Structures are given as structure tokens and as C-alpha cells.
């Protein structure tokens, strides 16, 4: 959890926002997945958001569902994912690592065991995509017992009550949802986000990172101009993996070429 605090403090000093890529662990196979993560970090990723392959990913679009299917095809299991997480943590001791996942995977292990395992391998945060704030008590309590930040999604239409709950229960960062279909509608989307960012700040919420539909440097810049602490990009990165599935070296080069300007856009 503290890794997020020190990251945001360092970035503030350097007048930068955070660029956070999302990938599915084990896509397209364990070995290449580790190379992908090293490449993202070398290219400037400030933190990682990682998915554990799950058979019924509700909140994911087709791109990330395909990533899950590729990981399954490679025989990747949740147990292997935790081994990979331990390896990433050994190699990169300071980078914040977040998991984005579904409640079933947590239940399968037992809520407390799941968060204990996260703590053991060095995971900093967990966002359980299909658990709303009002049902989150057993998850967030187990998370805090094991030094893991519970992350909550702040939708663009969040009312005051929800904003207060997110501020009070969330740690690490707040996942600020871009308006649905933000691309091409940045100007319309910027207004409500400014308002949400101001409210979250007022209620002392964890720093907001804007996610969903972030695929170009100007969107990263817009998120930071609206007051977000950074931006999360998932589908755009997973698409690059998909496009170069049979060319592992080209894939890594393309990922690097994508991440560098995205990170550069966070510099004020």
C-alpha cells in the first residue's frame, strides 16, 4: 500500500502524473508475459494493473476477453499467476502492483486467504470489478488486514454519498471511470470529471487515476489537466499484444513505442 503513497509523492515532486498500463497475466504465455511486463516498466510505466485470467469477465470488452482466452490456451492458472507476481516483485521491488479481478476468484481461495496470498507475493492493491462499494465490507476488511489497498471505481455519475464512501473506504488510488465512449468526446467528458476530482479531493480520497478508453497521449494529458493523478490504459496495450502474437520481439518493440509517449504526456 505504501508503494502508492511514495510513488505519488515522487511524481508530485517531479511534476508528473502516473502512467499505468494494464495487461492480463500469462497472455500470451508465462514467459512472454514476464518480458512484456519488464518492457512496460523499462518504457516508463509508473505502476502496473494486472488481470488474472477468469472464465467470465463481465466488465471486459472483447480485447481483454481475448487476452484471457490466450492465457487459458497457454494453460495459465491463478496459482501460476501468483508465482509470476512474486517474480515481478523480486525483480521490481518499488513499483506498485495492482490486481483487477472478479469476486469468484477471491471466493475460490477464501477471502482472507486470497488477500494473505496477495500480501505474501507483494501485491499492493486489489480492485474487485464486480463488487459494488455497498457490498465490499468483507473484501476491504480482509484487504486492510493484509496491508493491501482496496480500490474502488468512481463512475462519472457518482452521487455525493458514493463519493464519500469511496473516499472513506478506498486506499492506494481511486479508479476514475472515463465517460463511456470518451474518445472523440473529450470536451464533454472533461467537465464532470473536473467536478468529481474536486469532490474526491475535498473528501480526502486516494489519488484518482482515470481509466477506460485511454489510448492516446492527448487523453493522458487531458486526464491530468482535469486533475487526475494519472491514467490507466488497458485495451490499447492488449491490442498491441494481439496484433503481434506471432512476433514476440516486434511485440515488445511496439509496446515500448506505445508506452514512451504515453508516459511523456504525464509530464507537466
Curated annotation (Swiss-Prot):
Active site: residue positions: 49, 60
Amino-acid biosynthesis in keyword set: yes
Keywords attached to this entry: Amino-acid biosynthesis, Aromatic amino acid biosynthesis, Lyase, Tryptophan biosynthesis
Record bears the keyword Lyase: yes
Catalytic activity: (1S,2R)-1-C-(indol-3-yl)glycerol 3-phosphate + L-serine = D-glyceraldehyde 3-phosphate + L-tryptophan + H2O
Listed GO CC annotations: cytosol
Family designation: Belongs to the TrpA family.
UniProt xrefs under PANTHER family: TRYPTOPHAN SYNTHASE ALPHA CHAIN, CHLOROPLASTIC (PTHR43406:SF1), TRYPTOPHAN SYNTHASE, ALPHA CHAIN (PTHR43406)
Protein name per its UniProtKB record: Tryptophan synthase alpha chain
Gene symbol of the encoding locus: trpA
